[in-house]
Amino acid sequence: MRDQEFWHNKWASNQIGFHLDDVNPLLPAFWQYTNPKREDTVLVPLCGKSEDLIWLATKHDEVQGVELSLIAVRAFFAEHFYTPTVTPVNGMHELYQFDELSIYTGDFFTAPVSKADIIYDRAALVALPKEMREEYANRVKQLLNPGGRILLVTLNYPQDEMSGPPFSVPVEEIEQLFEGYKVTCLNVDQADENHPKIAKKGLSRFSEEVYLIESK
């Protein structure tokens, strides 16, 4: 994955403003729309050390994550006092396993993850520059089982007013990336003038949006 050094440096210097200390409230609010079953396999690309993994593992028997940063993966297990089984995989990745959770370290585009019934993307697509997003979407579609669903959280703001990441990914681009899939907007949270992205960054508008993407 390109820009690897950028993300390695972020974790190494603990510049992880994108990390949430709690479960993202949008996950429990909208997960039901994926029609989840306990036996559904869930994949979380570019998962970091997200608390969302813990929440998902209470709902599903198999939750997979992929994370470039070894620092993030080790921190995730250490902070929860989990002792994972660590297995080297093909010289490029390591697999960390504990109960329902399996996290691959390394490049998402080459990680040997299993296909999933549901993919949860809160911070992956918006972390990638525009020139990488088509490749990412193709990889996601490749990893989705027939009848699979994606719960996508994205951002929408004038890209020329702020350099990412996180980047703006408007609905038009989502529909283009997932052409042939059913794309449903579940929620648009439009920021007011007190939101830090508007108050501090000076953006003219900023919204966090939730989409359900279904294979037809």
UniProtKB/Swiss-Prot annotation:
Catalyses: S-adenosyl-L-methionine + a thiopurine = S-adenosyl-L-homocysteine + a thiopurine S-methylether
Q: Which residues form a coiled coil?
A: none
> Sorted alphabetically, which InterPro entries does this protein's record hold?
SAM-dependent_MTases_sf, Thiopur_S-MeTfrase_Se/Te_detox, Thiopurine_S-MeTrfase, TPMT
As recorded in UniProt, its EC number(s) are: 2.1.1.67
**UniProt subcellular location:** Cytoplasm
Question: Which processes are annotated in GO (biological process)?
Answer: methylation; response to metal ion
Q: Which Pfam families match?
A: TPMT
Gene Ontology CC: one annotated term = cytoplasm
Whether Transferase counts among this entry's keywords is yes
**Where is this protein primarily located?**
cytoplasm
Query: Which GO terms of the molecular function aspect are on file?
Result: thiopurine S-methyltransferase activity
What is the superkingdom listed in this entry's lineage?
Bacteria
Instruction: Look at the named UniProt entry and state the broad enzyme category this protein falls under.
Output: transferase
Keyword terms: Cytoplasm, Methyltransferase, S-adenosyl-L-methionine, Transferase
Q: Where does S-adenosyl-L-methionine bind?
A: W11, L46, E67, R122
Instruction: Show the NCBIfam families listed in the entry.
Output: PRK13255.1 (NF009732), TMPT_Se_Te (TIGR03840)
Protein family according to the UniProt entry: Belongs to the class I-like SAM-binding methyltransferase superfamily. TPMT family.
Q: What is this protein called?
A: Thiopurine S-methyltransferase
Q: Identify the taxonomic lineage of the organism of origin.
A: Bacteria, Pseudomonadati, Pseudomonadota, Gammaproteobacteria, Vibrionales
